[in-house]
Regions:
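Structural recognition of an alpha-helix C-terminal capping motif at a helix-to-coil junction
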Residues: 52, 66-73, 86-98
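Intrinsic, short, N-terminal disordered tails of RNA polymerase sigma-factor systems
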Residues: 1-29, 119-131, 135, 145-157, ...
Length: 205
């Protein structure tokens, strides 16, 4: 009877957990206390976002996948280093960004990659579907593809901040902490990036 009661309590707990939408900060704290499912949820939330972010540095999907995997390994093994004084998103993006920068330093004496060399398929995962989604016009679909292409050819410093702001929807303050530059610099880089994107779109039209 006691065992049946324990099982019932566990099922109720699991059902309740599924109904609750935990914040990232609540999930990492739950993970710190041993909740493995909280780790899985964080991975699910951030896998694609980090792929887009890291690819903005390395322009190589295979390498980006490796770096994102390394980011989650660090999340798993260094979970206790997270302190609730910072947002989880800032913390995880900083880890991923540092790993990407380390990879770039390793490439210093290797031939540099360019968007042309990699080909458009390297970034296909960030682009809209091959066919317009329901309710989306062909014109809107093509416009979105042009926006992504314009972002891809921006200088790295501009590309990263505009990805974080306009694609990942992070705040200016979060971006400043992640890329480790003053808030004013972040804003000016984003403004310049948006201007270049606008110019590219005008040429497209």
């Amino acid at each position: 009877m006691e065992q049946g009661s324990q099982i019932s309590s566990s099922i109720q707990s699991l059902t309740k957990d599924k109904e609750i939408r935990y914040t990232d900060e609540e999930l990492i704290i739950r993970f710190q206390y041993g909740d493995e499912q909280a780790f899985v949820e964080l991975v699910n939330r951030y896998r694609n976002r980090l792929m887009t972010f890291v690819c903005g540095y390395v322009f190589d999907i295979d390498k980006a996948e490796d770096l994102v995997q390394d980011t989650f390994v660090k999340l798993y093994t260094k979970k206790d280093s997270y302190k609730p004084i910072a947002k989880f998103s800032t913390w995880i993006y900083t880890i991923a960004g540092n790993l990407a920068k380390t990879e770039l330093r390793k490439r210093k004496r290797r031939p540099e990659y360019t968007f042309t060399q990699l080909g458009s398929n390297e970034w296909e995962f960030t682009l809209p579907a091959a066919e317009p989604e329901t309710g989306e016009t062909v014109e809107d679909h093509l416009l979105m593809k042009q926006i992504y292409k314009a972002i891809q050819v921006l200088p790295e410093q501009s590309r990263i901040v505009v990805i974080l702001r306009d694609m990942q929807e992070l705040t200016y303050k979060e971006i400043s902490m992640i890329v480790d530059v003053p808030l004013g610099t972040v804003k000016s880089r984003i403004n310049r990036a948006r201007l270049k994107i606008q110019q590219a779109l005008e040429e497209f039209r």
